[in-house]
Amino acid sequence: MIWSAITSGFSAVCSAVSSAVSSISSFAMTYGPKIGEALGKISPVFQAIAQALGLIKPKENIEEIGDRAIQAGEAGIQLENYSKFDDYMTAIREFRLDPEKSKTISEASKTLAGIGIAGKGLEEKLNLPVDSSGILTLMIASNASFFNSDRVLTWLQSGQIP
């Protein structure tokens, strides 16, 4: 059941990143408690990979990126409106967060959104097939100690994923 929830969750995140960020919040409120443990394993790996590839800055974290994506998305700043991932990231970084709104967004929603954004960035940066980051998410969730950030980053950069 947890794998089904993770798969559904990541699929929802990828769709939401591409279309409507509100879907992320809805999904996370429904399934977040069930996949919280898995998110705790996935998030640090995605964060380390995204930072190593320069997708997010050293002092940024997945949850903050997710919070920005959700709030900016509600204001019309959507990934699909940008031809380059870096331009989108600049836009959400410049977006003024509402601290009160941040308090109302669950950590699961922020984390799911941040993982989705990082995944889309990985796909663009490394010319990966669309939505391939979903498979990466499942690999990490299945065994985060084996599929750690160093191992996954090496595979991604070499193009030789087993």
Residue ranges and their predicted role:
Residues 2, 6-13, 17-42, 46-49, ...:
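Hydrophobic faces of alpha-helices used as interaction surfaces
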